């Protein structure tokens, strides 16, 4: 596989084993955005998140997950207090096979979202 080829964005992680598989296959950083079609704050950052994900290095796997289609995963993360609402963007560094992310941003603050992606992309350069 070409090391410079960007990975396709994952759009389905419905079950907990799917999340575990994504963490096991993590090429450097796994970024998962949780949102919903009906969520106003999710829509406000949609363009920014897409742009940031388009800038992802080849060793970053991104996922955009609709919580209405991933009720098991979202419900689990919510009961474990990993997320308190949406939009939520979770960052898992390679080797983290736990459901607790290494970095997270919750809400639609564009500065916080941008800084989150910068931190994640900086991590894969190290």
Task: Identify what each model region corresponds to.
Residues 26-29, 57-60, 84:
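Eukaryote-biased feature marking scaffold/signaling PDZ-domain proteins and nuclear chromatin regulators
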Residues 30-32, 62, 89:
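Hydrophobic beta-strand anchors of alpha/beta hydrolase catalytic cores
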Residues 10-14, 34, 46-74:
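Thiol-based oxidoreductase modules, predominantly thioredoxin-like and allied folds used
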Residues 35-38, 85:
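Short pre-active-site segment immediately N-terminal to redox-active cysteine/selenocysteine motifs
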Residues 39-42, 89:
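The canonical Cys-X-X-Cys-His
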Residues 1-30, 110-126:
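N-terminal leader/targeting and pre-domain segments
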Residues 82-126:
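Non-catalytic, surface beta->alpha helical segment in thiol-disulfide oxidoreductase systems
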